Amino acid sequence: MGVDKVMLEQDASGSQIGAIRSVAEDRGIPVQYVPVARLRHEADGATHQGVVAITAPIRYREVDDMLSDIAPTWDAVQTKKPLLLVIDRVTDPRNYGAILRSAVAAGTDGVIVPSREMAPLNAAAIKASAGTAPRIPIARSDDLARMLTRLKERGYFVYGAEGTAETTLWEGDWDRPVAIVLGSEGEGLAPNVVDACDELVSIPLRGPVESLNVSVAAGLLLFAAARPRS
């Protein structure tokens, strides 16, 4: 079990707080300053002394290590045609868990999430995944846009999910190594992430709704990509 993030009391200072923050940042653990009421909620009645560590029941992997395990070379990527999912700043743990459940069901080879501005992989996320989250490798990246460029160099084609894209999921070429990028619930894909994608793809909606829940969109896109892999 690893530490997903460290929460510090808002306006907290002093050598001890500074040391905690320094250790967390050295280990790549996000640090967040929050009101004391939030700390009390997260501590669930326990004495927190201005610091709460949010633990992750699943240890995140390094991106390069995960990719090497999936397909170590460009030729291996072209032969295996892996399916990757990249999640850009989804903030609701329940959506995160539901997305992971769909990813496992579709046979996704790996998931990549940002190190910051991402929902924690907590008990709520695990519950929403129906316990499937430990069955798929998940890695964290400090820079999604740069990481997508590296994916393309490895031989992956990167599709970004965007509601206004002219290309629909029915028109996408899924019979190749693919990484699908999903945006956040409210803002969608970050501009630099959009720029890093090879192509944007949309889900055509027939009824009078503007968009789908991000976990529903994930399921549709992943199973479209899984079809030629069946």
Positions of predicted regions on the chain:
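RNA substrate-binding interface of SAM-dependent RNA methyltransferases
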Residues: M1-P30, A76-T167
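N-terminal positively charged helical leader segments and presequences
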Residues: M1-P72
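A short acidic, often aromatic-flanked loop/helix-cap motif at beta-alpha or helix-coil junctions
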Residues: A37-E42, R59-R61, L144-M147, T167, ...
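Short basic, glycine-rich beta-strand/loop surfaces that mediate nucleic-acid
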Residues: E42-A56, S129-T132, P137, D175-G183
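A residue-level signal for conserved active-site and pocket-lining positions in enzyme catalytic cores
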Residues: A53, A125, V158, V181, ...
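Short amphipathic alpha-helix with an adjacent loop that forms part of the alpha/beta core around
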Residues: D65-A76, R150-K152, W170-D173
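Structured adenosyl-cofactor binding patch, chiefly the S-adenosyl-L-methionine
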Residues: A105, G110, P120, A124-T132, ...
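Active-site/ligand-binding-proximal alpha/beta "capping" segment
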Residues: Y159-S215
